[in-house]
Amino acid sequence: MNSTPPTSPVTRVSDGSFPSISNNSKGFAYRQPQKHKSNFAYSHLVSPVEEPTAKFSEAFQTDYSSKAPVATSEAHLKNDLDVLFTTPRFYSPENLALMFRLSNTVSSLEFLDEFLMGILLAPEMDFLSNPSYSLPSNKLVGQGSYSYVYPISSSASSRCNNDSGVVLKFAKSQHKSKVILQEALTLAYLQYMSPSTNESHIIPFYGLTYITKSHFRRLRSNECVPGLILPKCEMSLYHFNTAVSHKLSLITKRKIWWRLMKQMIDALKSLKTNGIIHGDIKTANILITEMHVLNGGHCKDFDFYLADFTSAFHINQTPTDLNTTVEYCAPELIDSSSDHVPTFESDLYAVGLCLLSFISQHEPYNELQALVSHGSSPGIGSSSIQQSQWLINALLKKDPINLNMLRNDLFQDWKSELALLSRILVDRLPLENLITILDSNYI
């Protein structure tokens, strides 16, 4: 487990679908992978998102049609997948074949490598074969335990400062490449099953490329690491809560809260339809599109997207370890009598805590922990072990609303919202029942 603050790529989301370019792009076309017909047990499920494929940035309207494809990144990816599958953490070849519904095709495992290459790689944005792409060394967007996030600069871009409108989330070192590849497999799968991620509010995935020390000098001379091409967003919900929310009127904040609720429920619905558990939902992993705060405490509409799938896994394969954030854990994930494996229910619980943080403008239990610590209560000490034990004890009380709403005025101002959160965090209402309530009473 971890208790780290924001690690997601804070970048602008474009209405995108993997891996597709607008028909208006000049001489630039991605191949949209075709779904394989199958009698797989879940083939009747229908994605909540059915939209035309989306647009890429105008920066990538470069004509490569006359050039033969360069397989540089492809060779590295094939080798890395072979290594990944020898000791799979989340995805085995057999599991992936089932997920992508290849199990009833002839020699599905033999076809799997070729299939994965087709849905993962972004050949028109291959850093190893196209020198027009670079990573500005002075523009770090974010970083986590496994990765850095930098904007992609393109000399072919018509934008100012060669801004391409996308970012690269890449492994910090070669031995951390597995985590990035697992996230790429999850995002590619979600986008393959639901060709547009706009209405499902899951971060779009534009493909994978490899970089070396020539692109990022902190890498070792012999390292070649994978990176995810993702769209830009304005900020994370964590940043919104700490730096923007206080500037807005209560009416505006309540409107945004309901928008956040609906869009995260849409994301959870899409994940459950496709059998994916996120495993680390928190305010730092919910990204916000371009937002403009207006005079009078108002702001223009914007959207939320669920991001950072480094802990995600498919229900057909149980993860070998738990890598999540303690503050956002459902009680059963830390209870000694449970299996400690994230579920659809624990994902919904984490979304509930994100919505609670939106109201309190504090991370879960952070305000109470600071208050107790400063009051020299015997229940909490200064050591990290004592603080962690205090946090675990607070989680096991199963009273998140009262332990996080420390101002009386919040109960009055957010009465209906807190009543709904009580159904999520205390009654532990299933997602389907929550959707029914929202459809009939709130939306």
From Swiss-Prot:
Any one Gene Ontology molecular-function term assigned to this protein's record: protein serine/threonine kinase activity
Binding annotation for ATP: 141-149, 169
UniProt entry tagged with the keyword Signal: no
Stretches assigned to the Protein kinase domain: 135-415
UniProt cross-references to Gene3D superfamilies, sorted A to Z: Transferase(Phosphotransferase) domain 1 (1.10.510.10)
Catalytic activity: L-seryl-[protein] + ATP = O-phospho-L-seryl-[protein] + ADP + H(+); L-threonyl-[protein] + ATP = O-phospho-L-threonyl-[protein] + ADP + H(+)
Keywords: ATP-binding, Kinase, Nucleotide-binding, Serine/threonine-protein kinase, Transferase
One GO BP: negative regulation of UDP-N-acetylglucosamine biosynthetic process
E.C. number(s) listed in UniProt: 2.7.11.1
PROSITE patterns hit by this protein: PROTEIN_KINASE_ATP (PS00107), PROTEIN_KINASE_DOM (PS50011), PROTEIN_KINASE_ST (PS00108)
EC class name: transferase
SUPFAM superfamilies according to UniProt: Protein kinase-like (PK-like) (SSF56112)
Active-site residues (renumbered): 280
Signal peptide (from-to): none
Any further remark recorded for this protein: Present with 1590 molecules/cell in log phase SD medium.
Physiological role: Probable serine/threonine protein kinase which may function redundantly with MPK1-independent branch of the PCK1 pathway that is presumed to be required for the tolerance to high temperatures and staurosporine.
Family of this protein: Belongs to the protein kinase superfamily. Ser/Thr protein kinase family.
The protein's name in its UniProt record: Serine/threonine-protein kinase ISR1
